[in-house]
């Protein structure tokens, strides 16, 4: 069975192009004819399915394999820019420098159409066909009130769109980073947001237009990308307006001010439309479309998480239930969980756009839910938690003061592709959740993170490794070089003068390596750095970093004493 992920959409922006994709399923529609008579014969070779595609589009009732719609990726010998057209939706969508799009945008538009209910997806057959609402949409005249009403019904059934509208209604003017930080499942890979202070600091420290553009356009977490995509739809509907926002932050003794262009405000029309999500006498609440796939995305045990969350959502739809009652219900389904996990899931349902009501210590989902069903093959399997989820369950119960969103550090620390996100979340924990000062540096010839408190400073190297970090000699030498540069503070040694991140009164330093876990001869390397530099340091994994943060925030460990943990020249193990 094919593995598809519906419910979360990136890089599909233009509503008119969405209509083209949906319209191809209507036999003899303008788009359908254009594809059969012109685009597919010209753009797609027989090798890539030309004749089969034309035959499939020539039927009265069109049901298409997902693979035929999406097409193939970039074949060997081609680049993404010159890859041949190999899918029906690729040929449907106009490109910027060519007549068609690649498989990635094609997949994004298909996800969009399925996620808001214009297409029905058959999981067993891996096919798509037009829904009743999708047919109504294709038959509506472009720009008409009928079309707007259908789009309203579809978009307001999409929980993440409702979440963004609700946040803007409550908080006013918000950037994509502020919105992204509150969208998605708590402490989970697949829902990361770049801490906004890091962006503002970076913008303020560069005069390069190229670097500013890179920070504003390319530096995003996954949730930030979802926000940007969804807000593009809401702008086209006239529900939000994009308006630059000025942000001022303070890091250490320095104040940084800059502007972020991707910031949004609710319009009067948007405020009115939001009532379809909350419901009122004049605005009947539109049912929310939740697909099983959207209940987890990147976690290795996502099917387990999707099933657990499906059971909780179904259980909370009828009457108010306590977390203890939810636990009993999960046990009846063969799922063993903790109160803390259940509460995080319930809070996350609000974060993805469901309306969750709380009375005393009981919860109820106020929305009517459509589309949510555990696939038969997934309901019959005995799904197990991953080792990461088991670790999260263990640590979650210990975090009474630290925000559970930082549990994502457990995912990121073992994901070798997420170094940057790991650095961002580490510094956000230390400077946002806690009261250390400092920032992510993370560029060439700079440490990843530096933090300080009063006279104590810590130079941090973040390393995300799937099988444990052994601290190779090259990285050990790199840390020694940072220690030496910080000691000498000679611009000729390093013109970027990264050490200026520390206040002038900081005079007692440690170094630290942060990773998911450690392996090999890392302790010997730490000892060697100490012997060469005279500076003490340690390794600390994500679990112990979180436990340290909890002890600090709970008042069991002072900020000054937290630095003493790094005197050991080996691995920090909390209580």
Model-assigned labels for residue ranges:
Residues 1-404:
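Donor-sugar nucleotide-binding helix/loop cap in glycosyltransferases
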Residues 378-575:
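Catalytic core segments in nucleotide and nucleic-acid processing enzymes
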